């Protein structure tokens, strides 16, 4: 076994600024304060770092700066993010997968218009051309993920808002599966999401959903999009540019589910999959974002 084999995962080029990450990304464009692109071998491949740390580097915020100049500078920054190809991140993709026997998983693929998550995170300088809203990235790999807390929240909201819907799913499973009849939905909710009546070691755990594949031929997985709020009918609406995950990107939803309580771990997994396909996840689901298919 070599010294490389003995290194922990965080020494294998997964953190922003690590040597192996730099080597893989020598030709990535970076915009200086003049708006020109330059090749810099110190640019990390960590997209989260690009979005939250490097994004405003080199932008001259001073009185008299023209809107058109800001737009040109941010266009270069935006392109450096949206032209990233998923095939350039094999180590990061492998690190996010949890291939253990104790993990239950299923994979779903984004549909048009895509997925947005983390919009509430601050990301704005009130200048022309920038991405105005936040986005959620895994801190270590820099790839988009759906936090386990968000997955848990969406699933629980289905129990709270529509117990009859949950009851219907349990009583009407896909073909060749056994219906679950006469179950207390309120008790099932508390058992799954609060661990009520269960030992801490026997409670269900909701893990981050991670990207495993991209279905686009060019391996792109991020893109710009716009929303146009109408806060006042007498004012012209101002489009807001934001970042999204493209359609045809496959996410793996991962859980550590226990065979304890009212239904089995396999029953919970199948239930969760049907809920997510029906309701979607992330921001702007009311206008079509966050929808998935098998």
Give each language-model segment a name.
Residues 1-294:
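Basic, Gly/Ser/Thr-rich N-terminal segments that form RNA-phosphate-binding interfaces in CRISPR RAMP
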């Amino acid at each position: 076994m070599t010294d490389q084999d003995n290194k922990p995962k965080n020494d294998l080029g997964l953190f922003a600024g690590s040597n192996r990450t730099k080597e893989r990304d020598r030709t990535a464009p970076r915009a200086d304060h003049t708006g020109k692109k330059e090749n810099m071998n110190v640019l990390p491949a960590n997209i989260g770092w690009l979005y939250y740390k490097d994004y405003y580097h080199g932008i001259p915020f001073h009185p008299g700066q023209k809107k058109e100049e800001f737009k040109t500078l941010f266009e270069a920054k935006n392109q450096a993010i949206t032209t990233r190809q998923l095939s350039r991140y094999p180590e990061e993709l492998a690190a996010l997968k949890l291939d253990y026997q104790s993990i239950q998983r299923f994979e779903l693929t984004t549909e048009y218009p895509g997925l947005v998550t983390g919009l509430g995170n601050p990301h704005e300088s009130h200048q022309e051309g920038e991405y105005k809203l936040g986005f959620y990235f895994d801190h270590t790999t820099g790839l988009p993920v759906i936090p386990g807390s968000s997955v848990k929240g969406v699933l629980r909201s289905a129990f709270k808002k529509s117990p009859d819907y949950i009851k219907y799913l349990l009583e009407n499973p896909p073909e060749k599966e056994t219906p679950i009849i006469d179950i207390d939905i309120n008790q099932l909710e508390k058992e799954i999401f609060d661990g009520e009546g269960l030992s801490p070691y026997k409670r269900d755990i909701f893990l981050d959903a991670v990207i495993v594949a991209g279905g686009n031929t060019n391996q792109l997985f991020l893109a710009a999009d716009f929303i146009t709020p109408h806060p006042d009918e007498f004012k012209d609406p101002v489009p807001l540019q934001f970042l999204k995950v493209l359609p045809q990107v496959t996410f793996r939803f991962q859980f550590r589910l226990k065979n304890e309580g009212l239904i089995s771990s396999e029953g919970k997994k199948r239930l969760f999959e049907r809920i997510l396909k029906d309701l979607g996840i992330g921001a702007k689901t009311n206008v079509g974002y966050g929808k998935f298919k098998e």
